[in-house]
């Protein structure tokens, strides 16, 4: 008797207990499980990759790679693909990470936490999706099976990795936890197990995972604990299958397990079988032709079915012999579970409708409910004798990948809902190789809203500090509500930032005084202007004067005061070189002239946790100096925060305007390349993609950007972005005429379409810049 038959026959004995229903003999701590028929199996859990939003070329490449994975398994390596959708009724594993505090921000914190809880709860109505691959091989004992399974495990993980799929092997406890979840649907019963407890209690591993009861007395349904279940198989009748069939079943809001048991047919045996079928068809043709001759009609006229069978068999033989195709025997089952029988029947009906849509049929396993259920467990055991012959290509079309999820723990921030899976998107930018980010979207797309939502999430979930460079003044209301410092840099503003401020006590690789001298050199170069900039003698004189005006601070004298720009101006006038007078004359306008905005002591709190620098209402000359001074403040703040072990989130709005000045553009390249190493998390925002990409420095910035939020784009901008970022046509559809708050999120090598429907309330009013919303607020007031 073959091992397969032995395996199936064991399930025909009536189980006297719930434990006896579970078809394995022994589970070992390293994850090797012995099942009937002398097979030893191991299980891998693997993550999803982006297939649904990939380009046609990428989808073809994924299917080709998946075909290679399938072809790895030979006739001695049966394997099982398990797709388990579980409804979690316990506390969600993605918990809100915003701790309660007693401060002035309780109303905002409470509202944000409630929003986040609501979005997490809406994530597929609590459906959690898991994917497993279980493979087994025959062996005389576990000692013989262990090294062989180890090699297979390494090969399978390597094959998946080449597809970009992350996987991990499950140890014995992990596998028991999976089985416990499958036999305790609904997530009501916690899994409690430790190997050390087995000798103490005298219990077996099955005792820790078995439900209270199984009831398989009915022909078309069964009971597991308090839940109703139904086991069915997929009858594949379509001549051509769709890659959407499996995905649509798994996307349902239902608790179910889809299982594909796959047995590879030996290649020589498969070819021999097909040749035998072709010979049989040839004999049938000859018989039909003899009948035609005897009846007196054309012998070339054959029954249509016979012609079709002959053509299909010839193509199949060609595939097996020359196209790297293999033959598989597939058992495709679906086990639905629900709290009530009515809900169960509705769920089965829905799955059946999807099957019919793709010219397949879902058939109930009448009087085989027990065999169907135990075959769905991630053990590698198949008690169903219904098999369908499939080639590699037709098997690979049941592609096990849909969309990559992005749900991180710790200080992960909320970025909306996955538009494909409806799961919450939680990501931590600081875990990327480069945390640098960009927000790109046309006017009204929700670009500023998305950045402000991230900002408020950073404020509530972390202790990090935040700096906003705001050319239009849009962030001021939000920053004031967060207790931050709004600094308006303008000729008529009472706020002042001195470019001469210097912190001598920062532990840094470079001397603070040398860095300040370098900054003031570039500031003077900006002010003096000219094609050639400062001459060597002028640079020497400026450096000498900088050291003189900071002499007392450098010596650490108690009487030392922070100098002003005018002190540098006066020191330059005292120098004997004519070059010093030339520089001093250029500085005069900004010290004693009408543009003396920066010749005042700093009178704002630069140490506030949230600082917003508003650059609205500045002329061209002042704007350049203001931006240069702002950049110096950002650098100093990042250095100071890094010394304290705190990250700094920087937001640069209207980024395309800031890149127009070559000095500022080169500064941002340095930010994107160097400051990230000191805990800086910069974000650039713009609606003008053409101007952004016109900058000579944008290539360096994009090359160091691992985080990007793309919202609705104008047609010309879409074409530019598609070429620059390699966005597929399907992905472009998510930023084409999309609603506000809809778009694409790029996180490292993960691309996810997202939707953010933020509820109205105090936070919404702080974040929105839409004229109709602002008008509504004024009406309410």
Regions found by a protein language model. Give the residues of each.
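Conserved lysine of the Walker
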Residues: 447
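Hydrophobic positions on the alpha1 helix immediately C-terminal to the Walker A/P-loop
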Residues: 450
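Post-Walker A helix-loop "phosphate-sensing" segment adjacent to the P-loop in P-loop NTPases
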Residues: 457-467, 637
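A short helix-turn-beta junction within AAA+ P-loop NTPase domains corresponding to the substrate/partner-engaging
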Residues: 483-487, 697-710
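Hydrophobic anchor at the beta1->P-loop junction of P-loop NTPases
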Residues: 439
């Amino acid at each position: 008797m073959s091992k397969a038959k032995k395996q199936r026959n064991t399930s025909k004995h009536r189980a006297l207990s719930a434990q006896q229903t579970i078809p394995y003999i022994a589970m070992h701590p390293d994850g090797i499980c012995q099942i009937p028929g002398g097979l030893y199996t191991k299980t891998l859990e693997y993550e999803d990759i982006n297939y649904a939003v990939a380009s046609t070329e990428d989808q073809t490449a994924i299917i080709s790679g998946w075909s290679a994975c399938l072809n790895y398994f030979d006739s001695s390596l049966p394997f099982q693909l398990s797709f388990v959708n579980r409804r979690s009724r316990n506390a969600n594993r993605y918990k809100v990470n915003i701790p309660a505090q007693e401060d002035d921000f309780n109303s905002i914190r409470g509202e944000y936490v409630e929003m986040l809880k609501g979005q997490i709860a809406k994530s597929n109505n609590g459906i959690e999706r898991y994917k497993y691959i279980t493979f087994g091989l025959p062996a005389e004992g576990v000692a013989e099976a262990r090294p062989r399974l180890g090699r297979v495990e390494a090969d399978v993980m390597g094959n998946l990795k080449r597809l970009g799929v992350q996987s991990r092997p499950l140890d014995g406890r992990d596998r028991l936890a999976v089985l416990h979840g499958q036999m305790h649907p609904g997530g009501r019963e916690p899994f409690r197990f430790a190997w050390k407890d087995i000798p103490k209690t005298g219990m077996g591993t099955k005792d820790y995972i078995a439900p209270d009861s199984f009831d398989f007395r009915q022909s078309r349904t069964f009971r597991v604990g308090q839940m109703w279940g139904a086991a069915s198989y997929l009858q594949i009748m379509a001549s051509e299958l769709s890659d959407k069939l499996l995905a649509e079943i798994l996307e349902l809001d239902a608790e179910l397990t889809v299982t594909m048991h796959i047995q590879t047919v030996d290649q020589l045996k498969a070819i021999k079988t097909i040749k035998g079928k072709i010979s049989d068809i040839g004999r049938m043709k000859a018989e039909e032709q003899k009948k035609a001759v005897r009846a007196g009609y054309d012998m070339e006229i054959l029954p249509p079915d016979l012609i079709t069978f002959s053509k299909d068999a010839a193509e199949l033989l060609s595939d097996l012999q020359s196209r790297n195709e293999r033959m598989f025997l597939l058992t495709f089952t679906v086990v639905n579970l629900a709290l009530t029988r009515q809900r169960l029947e509705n769920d089965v009906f829905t799955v059946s409708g999807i099957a019919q849509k793709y010219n397949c049929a879902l058939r109930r396993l009448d009087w085989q409910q027990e065999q169907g259920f135990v075959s769905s467990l991630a053990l590698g055991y198949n008690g169903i004798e219904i098999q369908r012959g499939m080639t590699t290509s037709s098997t690979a079309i049941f592609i096990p990948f849909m969309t990559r999820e992005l749900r991180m723990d710790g200080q992960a921030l909320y970025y909306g809902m996955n538009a494909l899976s409806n799961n919450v998107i939680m990501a931590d930018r600081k875990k990327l190789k480069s945390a640098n980010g960009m927000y790109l979207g046309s006017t009204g797309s929700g670009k500023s809203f998305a950045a402000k939502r991230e900002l408020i999430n950073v404020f509530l979930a972390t202790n990090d500090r935040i700096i906003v460079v705001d050319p239009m003044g849009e962030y001021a209301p939000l920053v004031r509500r967060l207790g931050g410092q709004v600094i308006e840099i303008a000729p008529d503003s009472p706020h002042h930032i001195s470019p001469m401020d210097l912190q001598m006590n920062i532990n840094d690789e470079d001397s603070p005084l040398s860095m300040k001298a370098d900054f003031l050199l570039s500031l003077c170069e900006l002010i003096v202007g000219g094609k050639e900039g400062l001459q060597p003698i002028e640079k020497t004189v400026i450096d000498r004067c900088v050291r003189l005006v900071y002499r007392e601070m450098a010596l650490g004298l108690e009487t030392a005061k922070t100098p002003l720009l005018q002190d540098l101006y006066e020191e330059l006038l005292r120098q004997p070189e004519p070059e010093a007078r030339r520089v001093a004359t250029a500085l005069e306008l900004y010290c004693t002239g009408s543009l003396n905005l920066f010749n005042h002591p700093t009178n704002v709190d630069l140490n506030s946790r949230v600082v917003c620098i508003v650059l609205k209402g500045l002329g061209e000359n002042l704007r350049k100096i203001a931006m240069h001074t702002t950049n110096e403040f950002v650098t100093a703040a990042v250095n100071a925060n890094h010394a304290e072990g705190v990250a700094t989130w920087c937001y640069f709005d209207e980024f395309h305007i800031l890149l127009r000045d070559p000095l500022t553009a080169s500064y941002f390249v340095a930010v994107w390349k160097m400051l990230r190493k000191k805990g800086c998390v910069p974000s650039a925002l713009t609606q003008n993609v053409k101007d952004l990409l016109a900058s000579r420095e944008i290539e360096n910035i994009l090359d160091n950007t691992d985080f990007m939020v793309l919202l609705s784009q104008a047609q010309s901008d879409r074409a530019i972005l598609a070429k620059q970022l390699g966005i597929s046509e399907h992905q472009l559809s998510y930023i084409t005429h999309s609603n506000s708050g809809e778009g694409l999120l790029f996180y490292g090598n993960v691309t996810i379409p997202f939707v953010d429907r933020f509820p109205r309330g105090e936070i919404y009013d702080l974040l929105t810049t839409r004229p109709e919303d602002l008008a509504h607020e004024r009406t309410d007031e």
